[in-house]
Amino acid sequence: VPNFNMDIIKDIEKSLNLNFGNWTLVQSLENSGGTEVPLPKEKIGGSEVLLPKKEFQALDLFDYIYAVLHSPSYREKYKEFLKIDFPRVPYPKPETFWQLVSLGGKLRSLHLLEDTSLDERIIDIKGEGELLIKNSLNKKDFSIEDEKVELRLNDEVSVVNIPLVAWEFYIGGYQPAQKWLKDRVGRVLNRADMKHYNRIINALCKTDLIMKKIDEVL
């Protein structure tokens, strides 16, 4: 059950000129049939146009907040404040609310690794032998060329074509693309592990693109 301050919800209703629905987050997901909640559309002049909803649900508000918190300009503007207190999210504006809801929903789907587009192959394996992470994965164990990273797992096998943007991407205080591998030093990776890692890399790349789109909307 969403734990919202209803006084704030009433202010948001006024800001958007919309009523707040009574679906829980789970009901929102169930009624949408998936992770990402689709917005209503109508064909006008041969093209699909997003239509405004008559009310917003808890998940819509969650996705709006999630989008704002992933805005690079928002993070830069409030970075000192965010170090000492909870984030302050601006009240939504009618002209941008649903765009941010859509982008936030896409981010949520990516970060839950449920987006089907994440299966697109990005990384490759170079060399022959078992995928034993023998090296400590320090700077000497990887090289960068044409914005792509080659990571040497051991003397025989490397992971190649890791996009630099994903390799250097931070979430919180760590870099997922690097931490995931470092946490597995000494282990032999299998096909399922590499498929999962490819999905992580894909999610990080797509997150970077969506964050830029969020800034364009804000």
Where are these regions (language model features)?
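Sequence-level detector for compositionally biased, low-complexity segments
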Residues: 1-218
